[in-house]
């Protein structure tokens, strides 16, 4: 049963989207949970800042392979701003990942199914339970075989 569960990636920024792209290439089900309203919400907060890395260093190989069949062409030179990084790569990748990426989905907790501080036996054999809250206060839970925390340096 656990192999049918998705891997949950917390954060739809550069690292979260790259992790999702690698999982998609390996046919591993994945759900990306992003607290913000769009991809790379934290990057968008400093979108006017020019990055210290050139385009080739900012594009993950798996992400590029997913985008290339859509006609997307990787920028090859220059130092983009955060906004250019989003519009030129991160947003197209998130779009191509489609319904795997969920916005307005703040992760408020991660636990093991049926386990807590008092019930520890067999913890490693149980799937993860990811507790998610939306901005309207609605909450839901997802079960996952693994969780990748790519939530970044600060919350958006």
Predicted regions and their residues:
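Glycine-rich active-site loop/strand segments that organize a redox cofactor
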Residues: 36-88
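Extreme N-terminal leader/targeting segments of oxidoreductases
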Residues: 1-7, 25, 121, 138, ...
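Short, glycine/charged-enriched secondary-structure capping and boundary segments
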Residues: 23, 45-49, 116-117
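Short glycine-/acidic-enriched loop or helix-start segments at secondary-structure transitions
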Residues: 19, 42, 112
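A secondary-structure boundary/capping signal
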Residues: 10-13, 35, 103, 144
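Feature captures the FAD/FMN-dependent oxidoreductase FAD-binding
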Residues: 73-155
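Conserved Rossmann-like nucleotide-cofactor binding loop
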Residues: 15, 38, 154
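N-terminal Rossmann-like FAD-binding beta1-loop-alpha1 element of flavoenzymes
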Residues: 4-32
């Amino acid at each position: 049963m656990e192999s049918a569960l998705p891997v949950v990636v917390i954060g739809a920024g550069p690292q979260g989207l790259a992790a999702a792209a690698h999982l998609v290439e390996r046919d591993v089900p994945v759900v990306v949970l992003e607290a913000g309203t769009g991809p790379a919400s934290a990057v968008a907060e400093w979108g006017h800042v020019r990055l210290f890395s050139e385009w080739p260093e900012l594009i993950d190989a798996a992400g590029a392979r997913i985008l290339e069949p859509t006609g997307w062409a990787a920028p090859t030179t220059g130092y983009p701003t955060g906004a250019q990084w989003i519009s030129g790569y991160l947003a197209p990748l998130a779009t191509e990942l489609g319904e795997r990426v969920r916005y307005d989905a703040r992760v408020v907790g991660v636990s093991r199914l049926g386990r807590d501080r008092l019930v520890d036996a067999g913890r490693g054999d149980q799937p993860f339970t990811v507790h998610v809250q939306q901005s309207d206060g609605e909450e839901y839970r997802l079960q996952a075989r693994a969780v990748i925390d790519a939530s970044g340096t600060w919350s958006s």
